Amino acid sequence: TPDYHLMINMASVRCDGLESAAFADNYNFNPTDVMTLFQRHGNEYFQIMEGWDVTASPGVTAREGMERLTPVTNWRGYCSRHNFAAGAADGADYAAGGYIFEKMHGADKENVNDKGDRKVKNELLYGFKAYKGYFVLGDYLVALGAGVTNNCPDMEGHIRTTLDQTAR
């Protein structure tokens, strides 16, 4: 809209996630996990990027533990194990989206030859599932989550969904 920009990013198993490389951003673990960015001016997140906790990216359901992540080169990115990520919009004021989220490494898909740093495990990225729905109704965003399941309850770190991450 003329008043704001809203991005909701998700990737089913039919898509590759956002790549990461050692010379660029090798902490691209969560941008396709329903990352939800709200912007009025375009620079809202610029000042906090150095201290950004990728496990608390806006809209993302993730296990706490940024300090336990090892940076990787991942040319396929991360996506969901499930084939459902959908959205529709009227081009103006209304949109809806839904996602079945259970993270997988893109290099684990069949017939992939560019494995990147697949040997780096980063186990805290995996082991939970969530069903998420989004509805944009004019100036309102309704975000719903259901069935958030911790499949590895013995693993350190709570599962949380972050609404926003700001400098203040």
Question: For the regions a protein language model found, what residue spans apply to each?
Answer:
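Catalytic and substrate-binding regions of extracellular carbohydrate-active enzymes
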Residues: 1-168
